[in-house]
């Protein structure tokens, strides 16, 4: 990446999901598992990148969905059912788990070489949704630990991020041409 390039000529493979061989431990994915991390808000993307990358700039681009996806929304948690509603009382434990887990997702984790331990609970739940859930889940939405914005993680590696005209059966996201930018942080 060149520092002076305000509109670089990136391709989906170079700015989408990190290849598995280079994928480090992240909030939702263990080292070696590639996933697409994004946000609809550039400020949130910059806040997330700034937390672990010391460079004074960041490369960003817009992607669009090629097909509908199903995501588990942990960014907006349900209200606790009333203790006086016998029809919904059985949901209390589940709702409390979702609310507690969502709060855990929003806690900062120190990048001290032991982050893989702090990330383990969220990675386990992500792997459940990705591989074992009877639901057909493509990703998760969650709140940024850095600015409260909405983040998305989609369960796809570089093969799921394509350039216009490069659509494949595995593709989920298409790079919007001309949207690539290098921004100061």
Region spans (language model):
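Active-site and NAD+-binding cores of ADP-ribose-processing enzymes
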Residues: 1-29, 52-185
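A short, exposed loop/beta-hairpin motif centered on an aromatic-Gly-Thr core
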Residues: 32-38
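Conserved structured core elements
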Residues: 39-43, 119
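Short active-site loop/helix that positions an aromatic residue
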Residues: 42-53
């Amino acid at each position: 990446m060149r520092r002076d390039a305000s509109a670089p000529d990136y391709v989906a493979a170079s700015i989408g999901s990190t290849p598995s061989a280079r994928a480090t431990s992240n909030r939702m994915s263990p080292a070696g598992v590639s996933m697409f991390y994004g946000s609809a808000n550039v400020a949130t993307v910059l806040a997330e990148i700034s937390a672990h990358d010391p460079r004074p700039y960041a490369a960003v681009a817009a992607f669009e969905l090629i097909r509908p996806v199903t995501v588990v929304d942990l960014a907006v948690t349900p209200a606790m059912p009333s203790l006086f509603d016998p029809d919904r009382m059985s949901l209390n434990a589940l709702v409390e788990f979702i609310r507690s887990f969502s709060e855990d997702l929003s806690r900062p984790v120190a990048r001290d070489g032991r982050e893989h331990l702090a990330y383990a609970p969220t990675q386990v739940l992500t792997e459940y949704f990705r591989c074992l859930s009877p639901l057909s889940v493509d990703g998760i939405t969650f709140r940024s630990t850095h600015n409260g914005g909405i983040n998305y993680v989609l369960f796809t590696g570089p093969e799921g991020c394509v350039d216009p005209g490069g659509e494949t059966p595995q593709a989920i996201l298409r790079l919007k041409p001309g949207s690539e930018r290098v921004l100061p942080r």
